Amino acid sequence: MSGELPPNINIKEPRWDQSTFVGRANHFFTVTDPRNILLTNEQLENARKVVHDYRQGIVPPGLTENELWRAKYIYDSAFHPDTGEKMILIGRMSAQVPMNMTITGCMMTFYRTTPAVLFWQWINQSFNAVVNYTNRSGDAPLTVNELGTAYVSATTGAVATALGLNALTKHVSPLIGRFVPFAAVAAANCINIPLMRQRELRAGIPVTDENGNRLGESANAAKQAITQVVISRILMAAPGMAIPPFIMNTLEKKAFLKRFPWMSAPIQVGLVGFCLVFATPLCCALFPQKSSMSVTSLEAELQAKIRETSPELRRVYFNKGL
């Protein structure tokens, strides 16, 4: 290998220690950086070339370690990890903050009428479907039937929750009504994610030892992984949907918004965006991507298999997903 860089930098793994919350947070702040969606095709292709060349042992003269890591994260932000295909722009992790701030801000501004609830909950679940399809597993891709079932079920659940709570909160404080969209999003996540990953709940997900040696598949591990993802997704939405209602409830009583009511939506979108810039990476970092559980928590058959092959093993590891 020529060039200044050593040959053993593992750019298949994140740059920071993923066993610590700070390391995971640094990783996800980089992965979800909204500036990456502004990169040109030429910049993306250059990053892909740097990454592919480095993996083949070729380094351009003068390339620094920081530049290599920057290329790796640009590559990861735009290309599917399994297939290597360029991902749909709005389905990329770097599009999460700008897309969610727009959709969530509008959901929280236009929540009082049934047509508005139907429209914005449909838009939100359509966006979620695009994200889930874009980031589908290359080894076990979602079928059209699975994607459609999850999409319709999550949209129905979100709309039913929103309309039901709107009816219940008609005679209470307007502030309480502002939290209806959050309840709808939480309900949709509880429906959407398990349905999207129903195959894993049936057949299990691969579990390994600490060194990555595959031991089998576990549905119990899938349940833990999906639970962690649902919790992360709900908490991710919480700051952007819980803090702005208090602020907007106060602002809408002021002369400025009474004079310029059309400013409500842009202000709400901005407040949600500010919260999401921090909430998205921090909540992604709550649980390690390489999650673990005790061998005694696995299915009896898998426990027996592990006792035969690795009697001293106490914990197994698996990818929890996002």
Swiss-Prot record:
What is the annotated localization of this protein?
A: Mitochondrion inner membrane
Biological processes annotated in GO? L-alanine transport; L-serine transport; one-carbon metabolic process; serine import into mitochondrion
* Record's catalysed reaction(s): L-serine(in) = L-serine(out); L-alanine(in) = L-alanine(out); L-cysteine(in) = L-cysteine(out)
> Where are the N-acetylserine modifications?
S2
**Cellular component annotations (GO), alphabetically ordered:** mitochondrial inner membrane
Instruction: Report if keyword Transmembrane is assigned.
Output: yes
Segments traversing the membrane:
103-120, 147-167, 175-195, 229-249, 267-287
Q: Which residues lie on this side of the membrane: Mitochondrial matrix?
A: 2-102, 168-174, 250-266
Q: Which residues lie on this side of the membrane: Mitochondrial intermembrane?
A: 121-146, 196-228, 288-322
What's a single GO MF annotation on this record? L-serine transmembrane transporter activity
Q: Which UniProt keywords apply?
A: Acetylation, Amino-acid transport, Membrane, Mitochondrion, Mitochondrion inner membrane, One-carbon metabolism, Transmembrane, Transmembrane helix, Transport
Q: How does it sit in the membrane?
A: Multi-pass membrane protein
UniProt family annotation: Belongs to the sideroflexin family.
Q: Name the job this protein performs.
A: Amino acid transporter importing serine, an essential substrate of the mitochondrial branch of the one-carbon pathway, into mitochondria. Mitochondrial serine is then converted to glycine and formate, which exits to the cytosol where it is used to generate the charged folates that serve as one-carbon donors. May also transport other amino acids including alanine and cysteine.
This protein is called Sideroflexin-1
Which species is listed as the source?
Sus scrofa
Q: What is the lineage of its organism?
A: Eukaryota, Metazoa, Chordata, Craniata, Vertebrata
Gene from which this protein is expressed: SFXN1
